[in-house]
Amino acid sequence: MRVFVLGVGATGSLLVQLLTRQGHRVSCGDRDPERARRFLGATSTIPVHEVNARNIRSIVKAACGAQLLINACPAILNKIVLRAALRLRAHYLDMAAHLTESPFRAEQLRFETGFQDLRRTAVITAGVAPGLTNLLIAASADLLDTVETVYVRLYEATESDSPVSQWSAEVAFDEAVSRPRLYRH
């Protein structure tokens, strides 16, 4: 499958490496190609395009011919990248929802009809759990001869002597300033 990964940070670069190992034809785009290449590693030959993820034309031009568009950018860019996927007639996968407009309904659901009309699949909010968790398991399993069973227990705590962020700076800021979700009664 021809796959284009938009956003080549920690999660995006791991996806690129795993998909390449599985035999997919992968290219990627990022606003900072040099940083993306550092995430991919010095020996990587995977093409990295400079892409403005706030511009549909920039995404479509870089991802032309992709059958799957993976959005590993901050969730605030979801709507733009979803429109690009529809224009490309590509399947779509993203990591998170940007819940500021409606904290109980992912904004990606507004695009459901467009994907159905094109007979394309959109998988939304596949980020940390199970997304990144499964990617880390797959990367670890590749280092072993055999794996019989994997059990996952998700525990939302991070402990370290130095500061650790599970999100990019943009996502952490977005989470901090988003309206809270209130449950009553």
Model feature map: region roles:
Residues 58, 71-84:
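Beta-loop-alpha module in the N-terminal Rossmann-like domain of NAD(P)-dependent dehydrogenases
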